[in-house]
Amino acid sequence: MSRRVEYTLAPPQRNESDGFDYPDGIPISYNLHRLRHFECEGSYPKYPYGSLVKFYAMVGLHRYNVLEGKNLQLDTLKSFNMRINCGASSYYITLAARVPDSGLKQIFQVLVHEERLGSLDMTCTIARPRVTTNVPFLRPHSESEYDYMDNDELPDWPSEIAFDDTKRFHLVKESELRDNDWIRLYLELTLVAHDRFLTVHYLSQLEIVKVAIEEVEQPNASLNTKTTFVYITYKDLAKAQIGEPVDRKAIVRKIINETTGLLRLRGDYWSGERSVITPEEEYMLLHGGEKVRNNEQRSKKLKRRVGVHRLWRWWYQAYKNRGLRSSSY
């Protein structure tokens, strides 16, 4: 059966750089969306969500480094255009990247689309050296590669016994953690996506304890699509000062398509009290295929989740998943 593909065409008078670098912003288009411009340089720059925009820029460079085999790092944010709407937004970021241990710098453009508010769920579709083009930007709304990346599922936290399976998990050594700063980026972005007003001081008090990486093959994915789950155990030392649990966990799923260049990140975090998969459930997953729970089992799992996250948070999460999704980019 043929697939229908729809496109969003940028306004003709403003298509020369795909939504980047417009100091006057972009007027309201036919779909009632507009871009607002923010400068990040100068003596007293004022722009919203400073940490979030910085991390989005770093994710773009991370994507470029993975696909191109480079090691560029963020030098400075220069400006960004933010799509103004009532839900998830898009960020057209212009930044300066540097090569470590050298004075070389290059201007980059990064485009990030948020899929929802209140949790880490984003797609990076552009990460490139700055260019100008006279070709309008066409974004497919529906295509097979992106449909697979739209899967929202995150796995349950594996049992401690499961982490002993070296064929399934790679336990990151301390030396590897220092050399792979993207792991901390994933953790900090997961928290900031949930609370956009977290300070740099707060984030500095996160202490990573253990990291396990799992590479999986999804049945519906193409050969060029790779899925990685990153399991992070960490201490939130700032929470200790107010009497909350210090030991916490986070899961981040990365999906990257090496052909299209699309990078999707989905993440969540919680205190160490959240229930995990038992050894029996782990055995069922590994040897019995898909789990089938009866109503009583589903009810018990729901009660455990509500007990940890509080009922109001569960309602709020359901509201976000239903209503606050990006309608277009």
Swiss-Prot record:
Pfam families: protein_MS5
Transmembrane segments: none
InterPro entries per the UniProt record, alphabetical: MS5
Keyword annotations of the record: Developmental protein
Superkingdom per UniProt: Eukaryota
Protein function: May be involved in embryogenesis.
Family: Belongs to the UPF0725 (EMB2204) family.
Name of the protein described by the UniProt record: UPF0725 protein EMB2204
